A protein has these predicted regions:
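P-loop NTPase Walker
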Residues: 1-107, 111-112, 118, 189, ...
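Conserved helicase NTPase motor core
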Residues: 6-17, 21-25, 36, 55-56, ...
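Conserved phosphate/pyrophosphate-binding and hydrolysis machinery centered on Walker-type P-loop NTPases
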Residues: 9, 57, 85, 110-114, ...
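ATP-hydrolysis module of ASCE/P-loop NTPase motor domains
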Residues: 19, 80-82, 101-196, 219, ...
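Short glycine-/polar-rich loops that comprise or flank the Walker A/P-loop
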Residues: 21, 49-53, 79-81, 120, ...
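Helicase P-loop NTPase motor core
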Residues: 25, 29-37, 100, 277-280, ...
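Conserved helicase C-terminal RecA-like lobe
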Residues: 168, 366-378, 391, 398-650, ...
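C-terminal accessory regions
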Residues: 584-768, 775-782
């Protein structure tokens, strides 16, 4: 027996040795999937298979490269070099270049990347004289991509009544015509996009059986990694290549199928043994990564799914501690709890910062944790994306803020003059820039007096520029007397940004909407903090001063020093960390509200949670309240917390997991007064008021009962209390309080008088704060 087989456990060895027909290897998290694939290929090479007769398909170039390197160490670099191993797209492009003439392309056809594809679609929309604010190129591109992934060509798309009705409902009925033109233009240009590499491979094999047989005969053994992530087109091509000889091994885990939004079809793996009746099923059930407790917790979670291939994952590692669940009072406190815990674990156990990850459901959640880590001096990085204040939509809004505070800001001016689109093109902008350079004045100065500075304009262009000038002038005038939070909302609404981002209801655009809302939430937090500290009129200039420092920090630290990783759970799949914090475990956040009542989507959300917790050490957290849509909302713990067997959780003392929404809402109404906080608006699901804003930006969100804390009346006389001093309106040193955003804390001292009466409070997670009682929102814990 080959020596390396001794390194495998019994289940792994059985999967490697079997090569008499189709096989499905279900590989649980941390079960040695890559090792099995690597050793299986090495075993095939050691048992008569030539390297060029083995096809191994992966989803990333990195996975293919690492696997090839491992194989080379087993069988030698020379033999490993000739393996057909790579991503679906790289392998199929290689085949298509060889056989291009059979489908009417040259061997040198161009491959369009996503940007090229989008640019062509944008040009076609313009040629068809369609409104690109309605027919957004990104949305059209996504629809065409989805059609191709289902092997639906332009004729089939046009003939589909269901698709046409969907496009009509989205007010983009001409997508089928755009798709046809796009298809034709790609062919005219001798070009394929990434999706075409799949489509044309399928067409090649379907229309030329002799070529299909050629490659099926060449690839005597086909292996596919991460089979649960394959789409319909990939699945069909695998069938084409393996139908004759049936030597195929697919590896994956249905419990980790989380990419349906990219076209992945879980049925491909669930129904594999139905398509290949003689297939053998192997289950890799030993987890080498996580503690026994985490494995059992994950098992108890995923067993709630109906559609799955049942398996009993186990671990022989240490038993481990129960998973700690942090119950934060607010989203702000949740960030502080996580930042403090990371700092604590690093100090006590000697972990490096890069051994920590904070996982969230949506990108917009990163802001809270970025700011908490910054305050704690903990370095971090955003994995696979930009930090909150570097995202395009955020920079667009900040540019408007900058222009309101300083209309002479050239970079902000250029960024927003035609965003949202208002018909002011580059030609007009360049005229303004040239005039400003010649006369050595600001762009704003030229905008106000174009004729004075020699800028010739048509009547229509002059009208558009005047409207933009009036818009900005209104913001400039408001800066000196309107609070930052209210003005921020006004700018986002009146500039047209809200209309622009809510006009596109696609899932692809949801992240932008959430980020804009989170920016305004952050402005509310900033104003509320400053108000409680005694600053009664916080202006946009104050907010921008703070944000400028944050964005400057974002551009620093591009070194390789260890950092905490912040990322969405979707981005985290396949990565390993010693310590993971899964945050925001609340209804209408995780599971995503977009899942609705669809059991299929809810099961995918549960699989997403399963992927998140299957790490070495795991911590979970949720917040009782979040500032959403312009008001403080009571949050319900995620149903997924109840799915986990409580024996494996270290739950908060208050059994909030089992409490119903109605009971919690009643309790909070009894405890708190009904005063509306200064920075809280009405009952609309959106924080943005006004007729031009969609009434319900997200129809699927049901506002929860508001969590309102009473304001403590200011003291009538001058005080300076100690633990033994008399109480002032019930507020004195030594008292425990519960604050709307900072949670539980103890009053250290009270000083000042009347409107200037302040309390110094040491909070469990937020540290020491000085609160102006006139504005502070907390209740005394009796």
């Amino acid at each position: 027996m080959t020596d390396y087989l001794n390194e495998l456990n019994e289940s792994q060895r059985a999967a490697v040795l079997y090569n008499d027909g189709p096989s499905l290897v279900i590989a649980g998290a941390g079960s040695g999937k890559t090792r099995v694939l690597t050793y299986k290929i090495a075993y095939l090479l050691d048992n008569g298979y030539e390297p060029w007769s083995i096809l191994a398909l992966t989803f990333t170039n990195k996975a293919a490269r690492e696997m090839k390197e491992r194989i080379a160490r087993r069988v030698g670099a020379e033999r490993a070099r000739y393996l057909w191993m790579g991503t679906f797209h790289s392998i199929f492009s290689r085949i298509l270049r060889t056989e291009a003439a059979a489908i009417g392309f040259s061997a040198n056809f161009t491959i369009y990347d996503a940007a090229d594809s989008k640019s062509l679609i944008k040009a076609i929309i313009k040629e068809m004289q369609l409104d690109d604010k309605v027919y957004k190129p990104g949305v059209v591109q996504s629809r065409i991509s989805n059609a191709k992934n289902h092997l639906m060509l332009p004729d089939a798309y046009a003939a589909s009544r269901e698709l046409y009705e969907n496009d009509q409902a989205a007010k983009i009925p001409a997508v089928r015509d755009i798709y046809r033109r796009y298809w034709e233009r790609c062919r005219q240009s001798d070009a394929m996009d990434f999706d075409d590499l799949l489509v044309y491979t399928y067409i090649l094999f379907q229309t030329h059986p002799e070529l299909c047989d050629k490659y099926a005969s060449r690839f005597r053994y086909v292996l596919v990694d991460e089979y649960q992530d394959t789409n319909y087109a990939q699945h069909c091509i695998v069938l084409q290549l393996t139908e004759k000889y049936r030597h195929v091994c697919v590896v994956g885990d249905d419990a980790q199928s989380i990419y349906s939004f990219r076209g992945a079809n879980i049925d491909n793996i669930l129904k594999f043994t139905s398509l290949y009746k003689d297939a053998r099923l192997f289950k890799l059930e030993q987890n080498y990564r996580s503690t026994q407790t985490i494995v059992k917790a994950a098992n108890s979670l995923i067993e709630k799914n109906r559609e799955q291939i049942r398996k009993e994952v186990f671990s022989e590692n240490d038993k481990g501690e129960p998973i700690t669940v942090f119950n934060a009072y607010s989203d702000v406190e949740e960030g502080e709890i996580v930042a403090n815990k990371i700092a604590q674990l690093r100090t006590k156990k000697g972990y490096s910062y890069d051994e920590f990850a904070v996982l969230y459901r949506t990108n917009a959640q990163s802001r809270i944790f970025e700011e908490a880590l910054r305050k704690r001096g903990v370095p971090y990085r955003i994995y696979g994306g930009l930090s909150f204040y570097q995202r395009k939509e955020i920079k667009d809004v900040i540019a408007y803020f900058r222009l309101a505070v300083n209309p002479n800001d050239e970079e902000a001016f250029k960024r927003v003059i035609n965003y949202p689109a208002r018909g002011i093109g580059n030609t007009t902008l360049n005229k303004i820039i040239d005039a400003a350079n010649v006369h050595r004045v600001s762009l704003w100065k030229v905008l106000n007096e174009p004729l004075t500075y020699g800028v010739s304009l048509t009547k229509g262009t002059h009208t558009k520029l005047q409207a933009f000038r009036d818009l900005i002038a209104g913001f400039v005038e408001a800066v000196s007397h309107t609070g930052a939070y209210e003005l921020g909302k006004d700018i986002v609404r009146q500039s047209g940004i809200i209309n622009d981002i809510y006009q596109d209801r696609s899932p692809e655009n949801l992240s932008r909407q959430e980020n804009i809302e989170e920016l305004i939430n952050g402005m509310h937090d900033f104003c509320a903090d400053r108000e409680e500290e005694g600053n009664t009129h916080i202006l946009l200039t104050d907010y921008l001063s703070e944000v400028s420092l944050l964005t400057d920090q974002d551009s620093e630290g591009a070194d390789d020093a260890p950092k905490v990783t912040l990322m969405t759970i979707h981005s985290a799949k396949g990565l390993e960390f010693k310590n993971v914090f899964v945050v925001g475990l609340e209804e209408n956040l995780f599971p995503s509200p977009m899942a609705g009542d669809s059991y299929k989507q809810l099961e995918e959300e549960r699989r997403l949670f399963y992927v998140a917790i299957a790490e070495e050490h795991c911590f979970l957290s949720f917040a009782k309240t979040r500032f959403k849509y312009g008001k403080v909302e009571f949050s319900n713990p995620s149903r997924f917390l109840k799915d986990i067997d409580a024996r494996y959780l270290n739950l908060p003392q208050e059994d909030i997991v089992s409490r119903k929404v109605e009971e919690g809402a009643k309790r909070f109404r009894r405890e708190m007064d009904s005063d509306t906080p200064r920075y809280v608006s009405g009952n609309s699901p959106s924080m943005f008021d006004g007729g031009e804003i969609p009434e319900e930006p997200r129809r699927f969100v049901k506002p929860a009962a508001p969590r309102v804390l009473r304001r403590i009346p200011a003291a009538e006389t001058s005080v300076g209390t100690s633990a033994s001093s008399p109480a002032v309106n019930g507020v004195c040193a030594g008292k425990q309080i519960e604050h709307e955003r900072f949670g539980i804390g103890e009053i250290i001292k009270v000083e000042g008088s009347g409107d200037n009466c302040k309390a110094t409070v040491r909070f469990r997670n937020a540290g020491e704060k000085q609160l102006l009682l006139k504005f502070a929102r907390f209740k005394i814990i009796e």
